[in-house]
Structures are given as C-alpha cells and as structure tokens.
Amino acid sequence: MAAPSGDGSCEDFTEFQEILRVMRTIDDRIVHELNTTVPTVSFAGKIDAGQTCKQLYQSLQDAHASRDKAIKRCIAQTSTAVNNLQAERLKDSDNLALIKLLRKEQSKLKFLKSELNVEEVVNDRSLKVFNERCRLHYKPPKTE
C-alpha cells in the first residue's frame, strides 16, 4: 500500500489533512487486510501467518513513523512562523494584517498539535486490531 511521503506543504492545513487522510489508508483498512492475509484455523497450513503478520506490522510501523514525522515537521515550521510573527508584532503592534496572519498561524499550530492526538488514537486502534488477530502468529518487538 503505497502512501504519500508526507513531504507536502505545511502552508495549507486543509491540504495537509488530506495528505494525512491518504497516509492513514493502511490503518483504515487494517481489518480488511488482516481478514484477507491472515489465515483462519482451517487454512493455517497454506499461508505463513507469522511472516504475513510481521510484514503487516512493519508496514504499520513505517506508516505511523512517516505520519508522525510529517506532523512534527509541520509543527516545527509553524512554530517558527508564529515566533517570527510575534517578534514582528512587537515591532509593529498596530499592523492589523500582521495580527490577522499571526492568529491564523496560531490556529494552524493548534490544529497541527491536535493531529498528534488523532494520530495516537489511530495508531492505538490499529495496533489493538493487529494484536487481536496476529498475537498467536507474531510477537512484535517491545518499544519504548
């Protein structure tokens, strides 16, 4: 399942959300993927469930890391922009266009930070479903 690299622009939050939505396809389809690739008991001998689960786990981890990196990159870029705009506002506190732009960037930063929470929920859900179906076939390495 090829997904965008997450190198899209952080300028347009709506565009960035769309990129994340596409990147979350693997998580959205985890149940279908498990149902079509991990064998039931009656077909257990025909497919190497351990290898299948291992590959799916690696795909999930790669997707999660890619999205996390993209979100954090945009948070860093937007934080820098907010800091720069705040410094400019100190020099020119009457500039309404500057104040409006600062508020826009602050809102975008808040939305980007909320995407980290969304990402945590999506990741937890996917790993829960994965573990329910693959726990007998593959034990992922411990993280953290």
UniProtKB/Swiss-Prot annotation:
Note one Pfam family from the annotation.
Answer: MIX23
> What keywords would UniProt list here?
Coiled coil
Tell me which stretches of the chain form a coiled coil: 82-120
User: Can you supply one Gene Ontology CC term for this chain's record?
Assistant: mitochondrial intermembrane space
What InterPro entries does its record include? MIX23 (IPR019171)
Give the highest taxon in the source lineage.
Eukaryota
Keyword presence, Transmembrane = no
* The family this protein is said to belong to: Belongs to the MIX23 family.
Q: Which named protein is this?
A: Protein MIX23
